[in-house]
Amino acid sequence: FQKINQGYISAKKQNSTLELQKLYKKNKFKNNLSFKKTLESKLKLNLNKKINKVAVHLKIDMKNKLGNAKLKVWFNFFKKLENTNTKFIMIGKYHYPKKFYNLNNLYIVSHKECLLKMLIISKNCDFFLGSATGLSTINLLNNKPYIIFKHPNHHPKIFKKELNNKKKLLFQTKNQLIINEFETEKTLMKYYEKFKK
């Protein structure tokens, strides 16, 4: 996915921010997720170029609820923006509450779709919002803006080590943030207003 020295960073290392930062120190790569052009052309969504396209991934894990998205907050956020020129594209393997499917500014990609298609869809959106999960981790290497919400009680010591006393990971650009706090409607709206076209 991420090119480095004429090759690619392994999927295992791409899922570790510590490993990515080591590689960044050594190679100073520029974030640029890449896929085979034929695959990307085949699997991306063909949406109106004039609208804001926001990829969203929310964690809804019934077995491990720590870090789950605050669905009421997200629903209210989407509802407030229902009559704007923004389309929120939900990716992931979770089933969302029925009321989410009734919002006309929400496009929910089938949970049966392959992971590769979801990643390509996410890459081709204008920015990304979501919970800290494996699927979100791939977006760390995108060159688009993103806000990822990490549960403040989920591995706090590891996260502190990853940041290494800094506010951001080494390879993150200006408009790429992992926020170690709970999502609120106010926070979501703040970054939506900042990143929208």
List each model region and its residues.
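Leloir-type glycosyltransferase catalytic cores
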Residues: 1-48, 159-197
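A donor-sugar binding/catalytic signature common to diverse glycosyltransferases
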Residues: 117-162
